Amino acid sequence: MEDSEKKLNQKSDDKPRKVRFKISSSYSGRVLKQVFEDGQELESPKEEYPHSFLQEALEPMDGVYGSGEVPKPQPYSPKLTAQRISVFRDSGAYTLAGSQPLFNDYKANDHKPPPIIDFGKIIIYTNNLKIIRTPMDKRDFMRKILQKEDVAEEASLMITGENDGDREQGCPLPERNGSPLPESERTFLHSQHTQDGLVPEDCLHCQGSGIATCSLCHGSKFSMLANRFKESYRALRCPACNENGLQPCRICSP
């Protein structure tokens, strides 16, 4: 019976098995995992990749021993007998998967079997992660808009109060040789002073506040240069306005 089983095993070994998929390291070329078409897995095959075969025989795992076998005392932590250990580095401290310390819980008489590790997952490690600011919800957006309107209204009220005080004191009309100027010349002077930023209280764009909604982002504060589908992040916030989405008036500001 043993001879027939050996012959069958030799015949099965002679037939090349088709590999379903294989995972290898792009840095060293070492084969990490190999699964054949029949579903069997082969970790670090010795026949094809002898340099990547680390152990000739693995120790009994999960505390399973034969009838006459006795577990041998281990001089080191049983966690190191696992086939695969995920080590994470965080500010100089090395921890295992599950936030367990590596050697802090080591004891000389610790002979517990190693924990069961989940081998049914493929984990991809990358260092090309970027954090993108989450968009505001509707309530936050409306709250910010109301805050902007309150700021603009307060500024306009302050400027209007100052102008009312000046009018109460009596601002003389422009005159020439002791007589008031005609309406056409007064309109021309008004437009000229408006361009120079001397009379912002009569500006139709900002209504005398001196500040207006941003013409680029229209108060949303999102930059048009931030392309979220490519690696071309130049600015996440609009560079033309302040934190409230406002900018100086283009008509009456100097």
From Swiss-Prot:
The keyword DNA repair does not apply. Residues 1-20, 161-183 are annotated as: Disordered. It holds the Pfam family GRXCR1-2_C. The keyword Protein transport does not apply. GO terms for biological process: auditory receptor cell stereocilium organization; inner ear receptor cell stereocilium organization; protein localization to organelle; sensory perception of sound. Residues 1-16 have a biased composition (Basic and acidic residues). It comes from the Eukaryota. Keywords: Cell projection, Hearing. It is found in: Cell projection, Stereocilium. Its main location: other. Disruption phenotype: Mice appear normal at postnatal week 2, but develop progressive hearing loss associated with early defects in orientation and organization of cochlear stereocilia bundles. They have normal vestibular function. Reducing Tprn expression corrects stereocilium morphological defects and partially restores hearing in Grxcr2 mutant mice. One of its GO terms (cellular component) is stereocilium shaft. Expressed in sensory hair cells in the cochlea and vestibular organ. Belongs to the GRXCR2 family. Interacts with TPRN; the interaction restricts TPRN to the stereocilum basal region. PANTHER family: GLUTAREDOXIN DOMAIN-CONTAINING CYSTEINE-RICH PROTEIN 2. This is Glutaredoxin domain-containing cysteine-rich protein 2. It comes from Mus musculus (Mouse). The gene is Grxcr2.
